[in-house]
């Protein structure tokens, strides 16, 4: 971030006076759009809804009821629900061109597509009882996303569509909350046709990303630095970086490398002309507590609930002195997995451990050059991943 700030200062000083660092391409209009605007911009229908969870969080969700290629057929369609990863939002699924974005591809393939948002991100930052300015609002991690957000959202979607089941597609933390929800909530698990897991994350024992250094900071020091509320929210300056800094010659490589350092390198597979769209909507924010939960996972190498810091606190939340482990062998939902050999967050060794514990693994493919973000943004994602998903969903619908 400081490197990008320095670049912004240099560009402001030199670029305006000497004509240096010219823009590589015009700013994409989706930079300033919300989710439904991004959808309709490409000629797709969009619907916005709000889901209220059992504990009062208000989640914005979006729907693409049909595609551009099949608008004449308005009958009931099979449902596909897409859930984003850490520090992200539903925009991840629609940030590329229509022929490169999974949400649009599924809509054109005849699916009723729904895009979820996890509590605390840009589109899910309200609660019936707590203000986002309060500490209480931010007292959550991916535990609560699995316990409250997923059940409420899936229940809403199925009631709205009149369907009994849906296809679930998760990326990164979107798979994490799926693993938890579908292994601890058998009733919910029965409502999932198939779980499509992209860059799945359960344990993070072997992850080698630079974020590990941040995760190793003691909790008290982490809170001293970042507070105890929101972590890395979307800010107007992100949009400035995306449109006025990262869209310029040479600096665009600096910006893309900032992503690669965290998620793994696959330099030839990122559409640089869409970089301003990616960066203007990400990061979308989460809670400090959620990041601390991931920090605990890095340190322990275990897949378990949030440790509240003392046996007494844990007893209050779990009726036991230690946070419970999540048992992946209890998840019997059919699951198809895609992971990347160059993924620094969902490390292949961690994925191998995960695969060995899944009792109903129906498909697995490892893509050697793929990093963590390739599954949502890679230029060849349709050929490498999405076409397989569409084909498998079609078979599952018969």
Curated annotation (Swiss-Prot):
Its main location: secreted. Optimum pH is 6 for short chain and medium-chain triacylglycerol and 4 for long-chain triacylglycerol. Inactivated when pH is below 1.5. Glycans are attached at residues 34, 99, 271, 327. Pfam families: Abhydrolase_1 (PF00561). GO terms for molecular function: triacylglycerol lipase activity. The keyword Transport does not apply. Expressed in the mucous pit cells of gastric glands (at protein level). Expressed in the fundic and pyloric mucosa. Residues 82-377 form the AB hydrolase-1 domain. The keyword Signal applies. InterPro entries: AB_hydrolase_1, AB_hydrolase_fold, Lipase_euk. Keywords: Disulfide bond, Glycoprotein, Hydrolase, Lipid degradation, Lipid metabolism, Secreted, Signal. The active site is at residues 172, 343, 372. Catalyzes the hydrolysis of triacylglycerols to yield free fatty acids, diacylglycerol, monoacylglycerol, and glycerol. Shows a preferential hydrolysis at the sn-3 position of triacylglycerol. This is Gastric triacylglycerol lipase. The gene is LIPF.
